[in-house]
């Protein structure tokens, strides 16, 4: 039962933020936290021109283990596990990967958040009052109050470097992983050193609908 479950605490020395800091280090950008030693070693040995980071929302170590027969390629190439954030929400984790900052630094903690200045709960990405289509303000509240610089933007400012963010959502009919793959192939043919951050909202989207124990 849940009473016998082991408490899991975030490890900010072997977590999402450290992976991102390793990528920043590899591209010569500034970074705020300890890097991931294993990833540092791989990047230095390979010395590849490009780095592509895929973030499959909700595909944690336990889910990957549970469905290893359906994710054979990923499981067979697994070299270790890392910790997520606290809170381990999509918004918190995704923003950490995109910024190289911990949740207490970037402040994007969940899909909806209360803002004292407005006395409203605001849906961050949509910039609307929760549960309505009413705009929270005539400016983007979260991007103003919780401003951060994406890693891809930092890399883009550097000579001979390209940083690009790609996002695909399974519930958006005009988007697909196939299109994302084509975009990545095109980007990595540049003569510059390229970092591509590619986000996909599965299996999180399916897990919300069907539960973590579903097929």
List where the protein language model places each region.
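Short acidic, Gly/Ser-rich segments with clustered Asp/Glu that frequently serve as metal-coordination loops
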Residues: 58-62
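Short hydrophobic beta-strand that contains or immediately precedes a catalytic carboxylate
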Residues: 53-56
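His/Asp/Glu-rich, glycine-adjacent segments
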Residues: 1-36, 66-211
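Charged helix-capping and loop-helix junction motifs
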Residues: 214-215
């Amino acid at each position: 039962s849940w009473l016998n479950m082991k408490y899991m605490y975030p490890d900010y020395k072997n977590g999402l933020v450290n992976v991102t800091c390793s990528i920043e280090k590899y591209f010569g950008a500034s970074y705020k936290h300890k890097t991931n030693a294993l990833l540092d070693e791989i990047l230095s040995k390979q010395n590849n021109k490009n780095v592509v980071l895929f973030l499959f929302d909700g595909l944690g170590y336990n889910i990957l283990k549970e469905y290893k027969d359906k994710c054979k390629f990923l499981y067979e190439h697994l070299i270790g596990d890392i910790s997520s954030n606290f809170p381990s929400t999509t918004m918190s984790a995704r923003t950490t990967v995109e910024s190289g900052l911990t949740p207490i630094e970037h402040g994007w903690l969940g899909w909806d958040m209360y803002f004292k200045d407005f006395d409203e709960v605001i849906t961050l990405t949509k910039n609307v009052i929760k549960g309505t289509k009413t705009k929270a303000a005539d400016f983007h509240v979260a991007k103003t109050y919780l401003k951060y610089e994406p890693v891809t933007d930092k890399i883009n400012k550097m000579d001979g470097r390209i940083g690009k963010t790609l996002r695909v959502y399974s519930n958006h009919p005009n988007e697909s992983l196939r299109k994302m793959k084509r975009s990545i192939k095109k980007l990595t043919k540049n003569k510059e050193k390229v970092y591509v951050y590619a986000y996909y909202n599965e299996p999180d989207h399916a897990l919300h609908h069907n539960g973590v124990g579903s097929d």
